[in-house]
Amino acid sequence: MIRMTETENDDRNIILIGYRGTGKTSVGQELARRLHRPFHDTDVLIEKREGRSIRDMVAREGWAFFRERERAAISSLDGLRRCVLATGGGAVLDPKNAEVLKSLGWVVLLTASEEIIVRRILNDPASREQRPSFSGKASTEISEETMRKETTEILKQRMPIYRVLADQIIDTSQISTAEIVDEILRRFQSQRFNV
């Protein structure tokens, strides 16, 4: 396990982006713990501000309403320092969000195979209950085949955006959270960032 000590002048944030089910939250929490930094999740920030779940926001007001709230939440992070931040999977679709995230720090794209993403979402009851479907159906009502098609379609749209924004890309398909964190820390060292 790699441990990093921080210097007083190190104020770079580590920004985790990627599709749902790639490990942004679990990796972010462990990375923050190892670095002794605060962890923030933009989806949690939005839910706290709105006093309700993202699933409820999307069901009642639609995706455009949620994306507006997401834009406001990300804009409010300007000036954030010395944190680990996990974003919602679609946060980068808004060019302003992408600009703010890139300006905040070092961006790491977490990826996984479509098969792994679908399996992770289907096997995580909390994830299925909390995350809204892009098709408008409740996540618990979507078949594996429908979820696979939805995932393929969304990834085709988002991967080019993710790749342009990312400073590093890590495939989380076959490695543990601890191994992913170790890899992120190794890459920081090789980039000569003071992490």
From Swiss-Prot:
Subunit structure and binding partners: Monomer.
Polar residues compositional bias, start-end: 132-141
Protein name per the record: Shikimate kinase
GO biological process, one term: aromatic amino acid family biosynthetic process
Catalytic activity: shikimate + ATP = 3-phosphoshikimate + ADP + H(+)
GO molecular function, one term: shikimate kinase activity
PROSITE patterns listed in its UniProt record: SHIKIMATE_KINASE (PS01128)
Binding site for ATP: 21-26, 131
Reported cofactor(s): Mg(2+)
PANTHER family according to UniProt: SHIKIMATE KINASE, SHIKIMATE KINASE 1, CHLOROPLASTIC
UniProt: Mg(2+) binding residues: 25
Role noted for this protein: Catalyzes the specific phosphorylation of the 3-hydroxyl group of shikimic acid using ATP as a cosubstrate.
Organism in which the protein naturally occurs: Syntrophus aciditrophicus (strain SB)
Pathway assigned to this chain's UniProt record: Metabolic intermediate biosynthesis; chorismate biosynthesis; chorismate from D-erythrose 4-phosphate and phosphoenolpyruvate: step 5/7
EC code(s) of this entry: 2.7.1.71
Annotated cofactor note: Binds 1 Mg(2+) ion per subunit.
InterPro entries named in the record: P-loop_NTPase, Shikimate/glucono_kinase, Shikimate_kinase/TSH1, Shikimate_kinase_CS
A GO cellular component entry from the record: cytosol
Localization per Swiss-Prot or TrEMBL: Cytoplasm
Alphabetical UniProt keywords: Amino-acid biosynthesis, Aromatic amino acid biosynthesis, ATP-binding, Cytoplasm, Kinase, Magnesium, Metal-binding, Nucleotide-binding, Transferase
Residues reported in the UniProt entry to bind substrate: 43, 67, 89, 158
Region (Disordered): 128-148
Enzyme class: transferase
Record family assignment: Belongs to the shikimate kinase family.
